[in-house]
Amino acid sequence: MKVPADVVSHVDAEIKTHAKWMRDNHSYDESKIQLVHYYVSKSDELVNFANPDDGTTGNVLFSINEVYVHPEGVGQHLDAAGSWPDAPSFFEIMAKYGEVLVINGEVIETL
């Protein structure tokens, strides 16, 4: 997501709510919807990524990454989100600020 500086605190709060929901409904073992990994990263957007000395744009970039053990994990995740009370507000920020959304993507490289 590319988020203007004046709404970063709101997006931070939504991500914290999402992370709690993820911990409540997902796991790295078979006890819940099974993930390989989940993480969220955040960074100031650079004017020129090749030269950070050029400064920042004033936007903040967020990346939410979820990788499931089984392909059906994405469907299980979306089904579970249907009963999550905070889903509408989270999906609203994703729709408003998300410039790229990859669902059910294939991991093609890793360490």
Q: What are these model-predicted stretches?
A:
Residues L78-A80, P85, F91:
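Amphipathic, Lys/Arg-enriched alpha-helical "gate/interface" segment within cytosolic domains
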Residues M1-S63, V67-A80, K96-L111:
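Short S/T/G/P-rich N-terminal loop/turn motif that feeds into the first structured element of a domain
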